[in-house]
Amino acid sequence: MSSSHTIQETKEVHTKTNKRIQWDDLDPKRYYFYNFLLGGSIDLLMFPLDVIRTRLQVQGSQNVIQSFPQYNGTFDGFKKLIRLEGKRALYKGFLTSECGYLCSRAIYFGSYEFVKQGFLKGRSDSDSDLLFVTTISGAISEALASVIWVPFDVATQSVQIQGSLSKPKYKGGSDVFKKIYGERGIKGLYKGFGATIIRNVPYSGIWWGTYEISKSKLTQFNIRQKLGLKERSSHSLAVSAEIDKNNPSHEVENEDPIIHFISGFFAAVFATSITNPLDVAKTRLQTGVFPENEKPNFYTIIKSTIRKEGIRALWKGLVPSLLTSTPYSMISIFLYEEVKKLSLK
């Protein structure tokens, strides 16, 4: 990090005299470069769990052509997939997913920081204001990113559910785009868009609200001291005015990475558990094959699932979802907060 970002060494007790890092404090070029690098690296590690999650969520649905054997849980799914389809199958749809994810990620995080900064202006530092602003900002950023993400999500999941028990319909992600567009037009690529919004927007709002409140509470609780960890020597970071003359030099809070890590865990567990039924319905709606005279929607999918499989079916895939979202959330938010520090002007 350059000298303009030098951490101000101090042994003083942390206070709220330094503001949090905001959008105006960041250099966009560095911010987006580090975000792309970060997102791709984490996805490479976590994608296999996403394949298993998708298959678990669609198995048992009468509207999805199942070409893989019945999985009796996450680990059984891994065992059968590798044995029958090989290790490469763990990354089915990865390139398609990554193209959409990296583009939507840029919109998602950038819009979150920008919208949050706008909403926080003129508001107090109270937890209630923080919860409201971050929840709304998270929801808005997800809605914007979903416009880019949904077609790639449809293509990715269509490839992920193709097993070894029948001839695959699609050769890959690009083939999915070509065939779906040819058969159903742009509407086919946005199949389940409403369901995605209904699932992802609440998830994002709940996640960010939980995360930011957890950060605030853990800071007040002095979690580092409670865990018996060494006191940090630096509590502020310098922002230079060299890049943006309209944003004078000032200091921002150097937040504790331990707090980011723990808050990411709380946010993932809470948001994933609450919205899993919405995720099951979204996946089935996007990957299902329905009669021409049948026009399924979010409500009918959930109603049909409960009637035919019981209410517990709405939590299918929760374990792999938690195994994916929790470490992903903890690691990605920890690194994302560090990216913000590296991207200071």
From Swiss-Prot:
The keyword Cytoplasm is assigned to this record: no
Main location class: mitochondrion
Induction of expression: Up-regulated by phagocytic stimuli.
Sequence ranges on the Mitochondrial intermembrane membrane side: 1-31, 111-129, 209-257, 338-345
GO biological process: transmembrane transport
Subcellular location: Mitochondrion inner membrane
TM spans (from-to): 32-52, 89-110, 130-150, 192-208, 258-278, 317-337
Keywords for this protein: Membrane, Mitochondrion, Mitochondrion inner membrane, Repeat, Transmembrane, Transmembrane helix, Transport
Gene Ontology cellular component list: mitochondrial inner membrane
Residue spans, topological domain Mitochondrial matrix: 53-88, 151-191, 279-316
UniProt keyword Disulfide bond, yes or no: no
Superkingdom per UniProt: Eukaryota
Function (record text): Mitochondrial solute carriers shuttle metabolites, nucleotides, and cofactors through the mitochondrial inner membrane.
Family: Belongs to the mitochondrial carrier (TC 2.A.29) family.
Protein name as catalogued: Mitochondrial substrate carrier family protein J
Phylogenetic lineage: Eukaryota, Amoebozoa, Evosea, Eumycetozoa, Dictyostelia
